[in-house]
A protein has these predicted regions:
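Membrane-interface helix-boundary motifs at transmembrane edges
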Residues: 56-68, 115-128, 196-208
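Aromatic-anchored transmembrane helix interface
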Residues: 70-79, 91-115, 127, 131
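Alpha-helical transmembrane segments of multi-pass inner-membrane proteins
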Residues: 126-156, 172-234
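Short aromatic-rich membrane-water interface segments that cap or initiate transmembrane helices
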Residues: 162-174
């Protein structure tokens, strides 16, 4: 009986599209952190395999493709992509096939999440926004503190705190820092909206987010955004 329960829990874990989306986005975030880039990309390989299998599972159980909004245009896009790959067959065919599978996965699991029964985007948005707020605040505090004490170094691809007189902090390059800072500020805006948080409180029995964290996130990300001098963030 215990083995059966374990298999059911394992099946429930790997068939949870919502959980997959949260883990996938969080892992994509870690690919931008210089010190965590390699393990994050390694994990991304396993997440890709999980995502492709989950897309097949959702199609079999939820009939995802035929419930997609504008599904006929998505199908046409994928068909043209396959046709183009075949008529331009080359040494990069395997790479193109992997990219095609990734596109299919994104269509089914991200764009197609509206086809899932009892789906509520607010819960996922809340968890992802909260993670980004906490993670970027901690990363920015580390980076800004090291910058203030003049601690910086270069090692292979890592340009810690400063790269070409631009602030990088813990990230891979200043442009990524700028982009993530903008996303973090937007996440703070979401988490500070009263009606959104009230809807979340109705479904998740956990304490709200401290305003200290929101203010710290806004302040450190605004400061980092200025120091990174990133045109891409505009």
């Amino acid at each position: 009986i215990q083995m059966t329960d374990f298999k059911q829990k394992l099946r429930g874990f790997f068939s949870d599209s919502s959980l997959f989306r949260r883990i996938y986005i969080i892992d994509l975030f870690f690919t931008n952190i210089a010190f965590l880039q390699i393990p994050a990309y390694v994990l991304l390989v396993f997440l890709f395999i999980w995502g492709v299998c989950l897309s097949v599972y959702n199609q079999r159980h939820n009939n995802t493709f035929f419930k997609l909004r504008f599904g006929i245009w998505i199908g046409a896009f994928l068909a043209v992509t396959v046709f183009t790959m075949l008529i331009n067959f080359s040494q990069t065919f395997l790479y193109s096939l992997l990219m095609l599978l990734h596109v299919v996965m994104c269509f089914f699991l991200f764009y197609g999440m509206h086809t899932e029964p009892e789906f509520d985007y607010r819960i996922e948005l809340y968890h992802i926004a909260k993670f980004i707020m906490y993670a970027t605040t901690v990363m920015n505090i580390i980076g800004i503190t090291c910058l203030m004490f003049g601690f910086k170094f270069e090692w292979y691809w890592i340009k810690f705190t400063v790269y070409e007189n631009r602030f990088t902090g813990c990230y891979d390059n200043p442009n990524l820092l700028g982009f993530i800072s903008v996303v973090s500020i937007f996440c703070c805006h979401i988490l500070s909206k009263g009606h959104f948080m009230r809807r979340i409180a109705e479904k998740i029995p956990e304490p709200g987010i401290s305003k200290i964290w929101i203010v710290a996130c806004l302040a450190t990300n605004a400061f980092s955004l200025i120091l990174c001098d990133s045109n891409a963030s505009l």
